[in-house]
């Protein structure tokens, strides 16, 4: 029941260009990335990153790295022109357990929003959910000061689930049943005032308006869109970031 349209592109990604009379090239690491499609019986049950503004909800981190927060190959490491010593990895049994957890949560309609933790780590995952839902977010990290960067920017496998407060216990019980009891933690709640606040027990890291952060996040894409697409349309889309309506 699964269709795989392509799987070879990631095995041969290479780009070549001329710079100052010399040929330059970048060849991507050889790693198989497969895209797949499956039938969807009811599009109304599809999980998206669009955060609900309901304050009687919680955001739960399902951390398949189980707190290791390895930074190798992360965007943050590359920003500092490093690769890191230890890269994230996964345990096969945990992937199966994660699938079972999410499937049961979805079947029971416990999940309001879902986003995988990927490029940029946990902080970017949370911000993208807030941006999509046009709402604020209160993030509380239970880590020491020397662990903050790793917790926010590690790209360990995992996901963030938004669930109604009344179903948090259900998710935790299900996680324990599939062997992920120590991998699920409550990480954040929505804010109605549109502010993004990130705290640790020791100090406040971020306190900013959602739209201010989203304008920074979208700045590069906006600049590209003005060149590639219709500039007026790109400007209109960029200006709409300040609006509170998340759209369809």
What are these regions (language model features)?
Residues 156-158:
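Short, solvent-exposed beta-strand edge segments and adjacent coil->beta transition regions
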Residues 3-153, 165-248:
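Intein/HINT protein-splicing elements and their conserved insertion hotspots or analogous self-processing inserts
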């Amino acid at each position: 029941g699964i269709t795989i349209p392509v799987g070879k592109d990631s095995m041969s990604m290479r780009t070549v260009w001329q710079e100052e009379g010399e040929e330059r090239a970048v060849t991507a690491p050889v790693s198989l990335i497969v895209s797949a499609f499956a039938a969807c019986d009811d599009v109304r049950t599809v999980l998206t990153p669009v955060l609900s503004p309901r304050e009687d909800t919680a955001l739960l981190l399902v951390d398949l790295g189980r707190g290791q927060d390895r930074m190798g190959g992360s965007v943050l490491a590359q920003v500092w022109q490093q690769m890191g010593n230890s890269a994230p990895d996964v345990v096969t049994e945990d992937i199966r357990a994660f699938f079972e957890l999410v499937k049961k949560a979805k079947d029971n309609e416990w999940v309001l929003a879902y986003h995988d933790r990927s490029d940029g780590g946990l902080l970017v995952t949370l911000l993208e959910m807030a941006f999509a839902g046009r709402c604020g977010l209160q993030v509380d990290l239970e880590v020491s000061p020397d662990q903050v960067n790793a917790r926010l920017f590690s790209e360990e496998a995992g996901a963030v689930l938004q669930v109604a407060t009344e179903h948090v216990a259900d998710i935790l019980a299900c996680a324990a049943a599939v062997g992920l009891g120590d991998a699920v933690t409550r990480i954040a709640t929505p804010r109605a005032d549109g502010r993004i606040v990130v705290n640790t027990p020791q100090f406040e890291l971020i306190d900013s308006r959602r739209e201010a952060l989203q304008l920074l996040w979208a700045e590069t894409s906006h600049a590209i869109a003005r060149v590639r697409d219709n500039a007026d349309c790109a400007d209109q889309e960029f200006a709409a970031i300040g609006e509170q309506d998340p759209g369809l």
